[in-house]
């Protein structure tokens, strides 16, 4: 996978197949080789990049089998792009068994020229008992081992029923094989019953235990209603037969659900049928023609949702889109609640900050991954600082607004830990300008009017609520100095603030009071402060951290060959990375070092610490200053 854009676990990426690249996220429409209602060529203008067809149907149909072996799969289907083949697993689930074994099915897919072949895995249903589901996981793994030496891209499905630990086990087993593509199987019954919350457990326990360098496919997840949620959790591809199945039942797909033809009065303007038919005219078509036209509408709805999701990823606003869609159906809201229960996991893959503002809707917003990140830091901060602590509500201190008088008359006259209320929690006051604290757009809904929930966070610590007291005397501390140290601790790790910002640093402040840059006493630039409230380090600033933080903290280790180029200011490519700090946050500054821990450059990591070690193509760190540039 070559990553192009990312938004947490969601990504726009490309992977190569023998018949060209596929850019994800996308949908592979299911093509029935016996009945080609709409050809792949007709689908191309909608955004088609590949299709999926069933090798079992071809194998068991003599005419199709002979033609596929003679002319090849692509000639049979009439499509020159990437084709994935399924193995017949779902048919074995529906009909009880099929007449071919795993090796025969995979070998046939290879012989007819499938771009992505799938093993004959063992399907498990939501009702499958756990011991039986575990046997299916082991058998599916063994079947992958049977064909582990096959050439080409082999899809190794993740099974495990509704049991998160079995999904984890299956993912880890498949990840240890040569499978180059990972479908998540056995989920169609859950999709059909709108059991999206269970599906959340399945997806996330599969995704985080698979390599980030391989595509993840949600088998049978062909309705756009759940696309955004799935992509948010790291799914790259879907397949869809729903466009034609629903059409045969006179059901029209919309991004937010499905509607019966008998119950609609108007067609949406985006529908390809809008300027060609009235609803009555569609109803009056003969059955075959009507199904075909509705299928075209359904395909448009499916690809339109994929386009919207990709745009949200570019904007770094997919989380907002998911939050909005969650409120369109109770089953989606239940799924969203389940997603938020995984915030501590999701937070590891979220960027340091985003292009878009943080939208605060209601109490669900207090469970956002960014809130989890800040809460964890706040708890650590209070645990390590044994001073008295004051908590200031938004009535006294409002993030994003000038609080100069309050800073002068209160903060700088008492030596204490200062917390401010924000989005249903308490955060250190010094982080007031960092993302997402300042960059919040609030609904005005106060989920915790008496701050009882926020107080739970600080309950283990001795905290006094500020009641409007006035403090006399001289200034005992500098807010700006404490601010830059606190931001550095939050951004780079506890204790870093004092490492790089001594008492005698010079802090440049704009006319509006915002910090712009920090210099050493001698006038050397240490860092600049960005619009999101975080720092961009200079090479000199990075060297101060490097000299005091032990490896692997903040490090991306590269080969000596790469380090020479990085020292000149060139970016780091994934293929040259030898190791990285597991705790690196995407879009945060990192130290680029060689095998001997010699600092070569400082730059912005494009992905998280784990991802830095797993991707093999593209830019991993955008260097903004190398050693050679600094020395000039």
Swiss-Prot record:
Pathway: tRNA modification; archaeosine-tRNA biosynthesis. Its cofactor is Zn(2+). CDD domains: PUA_archaeosine_TGT. Keywords: Glycosyltransferase, Metal-binding, Transferase, tRNA processing, Zinc. Residues 553-628 form the PUA domain. GO terms for biological process: tRNA wobble guanine modification. GO terms for molecular function: pentosyltransferase activity; RNA binding; zinc ion binding. Binds 1 zinc ion per subunit. It comes from the Archaea. Substrate binds at residues 121, 186. It catalyses: guanosine(15) in tRNA + 7-cyano-7-deazaguanine = 7-cyano-7-carbaguanosine(15) in tRNA + guanine. It holds the Pfam family TGT_C2. The active site is at 86 (nucleophile). Exchanges the guanine residue with 7-cyano-7-deazaguanine (preQ0) at position 15 in the dihydrouridine loop (D-loop) of archaeal tRNAs. PANTHER family: QUEUINE TRNA-RIBOSYLTRANSFERASE. Belongs to the archaeosine tRNA-ribosyltransferase family. This is tRNA-guanine(15) transglycosylase. It comes from Thermoplasma acidophilum (strain ATCC 25905 / DSM 1728 / JCM 9062 / NBRC 15155 / AMRC-C165).
């Amino acid at each position: 996978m070559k990553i192009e854009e990312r938004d947490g676990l969601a990504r726009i990426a490309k992977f190569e197949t023998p018949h060209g690249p596929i850019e994800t996220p996308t949908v592979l429409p299911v093509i029935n080789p016996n009945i080609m209602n709409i050809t792949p060529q007709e689908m191309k203008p909608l955004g088609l990049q590949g299709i999926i067809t069933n090798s079992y149907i071809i194998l068991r149909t003599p005419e199709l089998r002979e033609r596929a072996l003679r002319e090849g799969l692509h000639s049979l289907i009439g499509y020159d792009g990437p084709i994935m083949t399924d193995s017949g697993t779902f048919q074995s689930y529906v009909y009880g068994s099929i007449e071919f074994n795993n090796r025969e099915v995979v070998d046939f897919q290879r012989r007819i020229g499938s771009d992505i072949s799938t093993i004959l895995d063992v399907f498990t249903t939501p009702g499958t008992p756990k011991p039986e589901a575990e046997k299916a996981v082991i058998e599916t793994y063994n079947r992958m081992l049977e064909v582990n030496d096959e050439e080409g891209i082999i899809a190794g499905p993740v099974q495990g029923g509704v049991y998160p630990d079995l999904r984890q086990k299956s993912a880890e087993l498949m990840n240890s094989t040569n499978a180059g593509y990972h479908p998540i199987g056995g989920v169609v019954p859950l999709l059909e019953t709108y059991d999206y919350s269970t599906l959340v457990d399945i997806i996330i326990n599969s995704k985080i235990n698979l390599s980030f360098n391989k595509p993840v496919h949600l088998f049978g997840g062909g309705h756009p209603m759940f696309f955004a949620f799935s992509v948010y959790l790291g799914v790259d591809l879907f397949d869809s037969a729903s466009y034609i199945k629903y059409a045969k039942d006179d059901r029209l797909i919309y991004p937010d659900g499905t509607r019966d033809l008998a119950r609609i009065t108007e067609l949406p303007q985006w529908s390809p049928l809008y300027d060609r038919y009235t609803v009555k005219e569609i109803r009056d078509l003969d059955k075959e023609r009507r199904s075909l036209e509705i299928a075209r509408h359904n395909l448009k709805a499916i690809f339109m949702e994929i386009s919207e999701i990709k745009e949200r990823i570019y904007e770094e606003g997919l989380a907002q889109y998911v939050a909005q869609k969650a409120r369109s159906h109770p089953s989606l809201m239940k799924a969203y609640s389940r997603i938020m229960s995984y915030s501590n996991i999701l937070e590891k893959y979220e960027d340091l900050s985003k292009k878009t503002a943080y939208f605060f809707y209601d109490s669900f917003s207090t469970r956002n991954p960014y809130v989890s990140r800040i809460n964890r830091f706040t708890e650590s901060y209070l645990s390590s600082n044994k001073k008295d602590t004051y908590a200031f509500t938004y009535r006294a201190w409002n993030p994003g607004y000038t609080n100069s008088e309050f800073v002068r008359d209160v903060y700088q006259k008492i030596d204490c830990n200062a917390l401010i209320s924000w989005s249903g929690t308490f955060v250190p006051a010094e982080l007031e300008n960092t993302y997402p604290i300042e960059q919040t757009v609030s609904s005005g809904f106060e989920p915790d009017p008496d701050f009882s929930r926020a107080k739970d966070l600080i309950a283990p610590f001795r905290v006094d609520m500020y009641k409007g007291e006035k403090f006399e005397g001289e200034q005992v501390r500098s807010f700006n100095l404490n601010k830059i140290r606190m931001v550095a601790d939050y951004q780079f790790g506890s204790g870093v603030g004092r490492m790089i910002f001594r008492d005698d640093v010079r802090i440049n402040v704009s006319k509006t009071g915002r910090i712009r840059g920090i210099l050493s006493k001698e006038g050397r630039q240490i860092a600049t402060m960005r619009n999101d409230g975080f720092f961009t380090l200079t090479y000199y600033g990075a060297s101060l951290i490097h000299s005091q933080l032990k490896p692997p903290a903040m490090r991306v280790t590269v080969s000596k060959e790469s380090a020479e180029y990085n020292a000149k200011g060139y970016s780091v490519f994934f293929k040259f990375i030898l190791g990285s700090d597991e705790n690196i946050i995407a879009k945060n500054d990192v130290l680029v070092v060689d095998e001997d821990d010699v600092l070569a450059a400082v730059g912005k990591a494009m992905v998280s610490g784990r991802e830095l070690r797993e991707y093999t193509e593209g830019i991993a760190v955008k260097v903004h200053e190398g050693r050679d540039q600094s020395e000039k």
